[in-house]
Amino acid sequence: GAFLIPFLPKIGRQVYMIFLVILSAFSLFNGFGTHLTINVLDYNFIINYSDNLSLPFAIVVHIAAFITIIYGAHKDDWKENVAVISYAGAAIAALHAGDLFTLFFWWEATAFTSVFLILGGNTTRAYRAAFRYIVIQVGSGMFLLAGAVLFLYSNGNALLGQMSIDDTSGLLIFLAFGIKAAFPFLNGWLQDTYPEASEVGTVALSSFTTKLAIYALARSFAGTDILIYIGALMTFFPIFFAVIENDLRRVLAYSLNNQLGFMVVAVGIGTELAINGAVAHAFAHIIYKGLLFMSMGAVLYRVGTCKASELGGLFKYMPITAVCSIIGAISISAFPLFSGFVAKSLIMSSLGYEGLSFIYFMLLFASAGVLHHSGIKIPFFAFFAHKSGHKPKEAPLNMIIAMVIGSVLCILIGIFPSVFYQILPYSVEYQPYDFSHVLSQLQLLTFAAFAFICLW
């Protein structure tokens, strides 16, 4: 469907893209099971497979695609339109892949479609970052392909399911997923590229690539113990870089890496509660991190910079953008009554039930860091702090609509967690709003806020 976009006028493109997302969303009602296979040379490619794990990821990717299209509606750029819809389509198709070779095809498709969003930054830095990005992403695909071939040779099939890193094939596939999930020492591409993309491109990038990797890890490596320690390290080390970073979009990129760590820990635990936590956190994260990137993208669009040292005092001129940014910041910080709280609580509780006290306290420290660098630093330096002298207009109406949709979702998920929990892979009887959970989280947030005040 994306091939028609260049031939349509601006308004027609936006309407057509939304139509494609809605049309794709009908697939969510197909039910669980295998819906489409293609036989080539006696090999069955499972093109469309759905179950209780893929469904919540597919739902939120459709939501993110819809919001991203609205967010970018002010731009008359058919190349970016094609990239956004193709990228979203590739991610959705990858979520429904039932075998490793089908996954490989769409895995690489997400790489080649998303690179154009980085090129859309239209700077020398963006062009160089895009080259590095595609090399890394194609490398991930090559590991996946090599692992798939070995897996087929060893097992007689290439079904996408539970694997072990004790096998060479499993280890190669694990490495492929780890690159896309931005594991420690494999994560440089994320902070290198996301801040260089266009304001629309960064929103799309934050939603699809890394969450596809989390889905793949949950599909194939749930309960792999080493993921607990990899994830804990991911939550920990980006905090220090985010605290000292001046570019607020790069701060959010470090923060994204930190949040992925929570999901990876949950996948490593592998219990039903933990997998629910990983999926819930990925779902909520796509929305609130997209909201934060949208708010900073609006600032970049109106002011021309996202450097903290050059911003401040914008609340007076961009109040709606500021409020939406604050809602995103509150959500990522896991304040009660917002989406981050009801998602992250599942992960923290699963750690407690498994007796992983050291990892639990590492994630508590990481949670305090999230409040510092994303919950406070982002809205404070952009919209408050010192007066920068900038007097921009409020964001365009389409940007505001997209940010308001994201804000409303952050609030609704936080207020109605039982409804949210119904789409998770496993049935769950969990109450996030018991007294101990709320009190401990408020204490953590209070002390983290106090630390920010002291350091500032």
What are the residue ranges of the model-derived segments?
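Alpha-helical transmembrane segments
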Residues: 1, 16-27, 62-65, 85-89, ...
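Membrane-helix interface motif
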Residues: 29-38, 150-157, 332-347, 412-431
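Short aromatic-rich membrane-water interface segments that cap or initiate transmembrane helices
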Residues: 41-57, 163-170, 350-361, 433-439
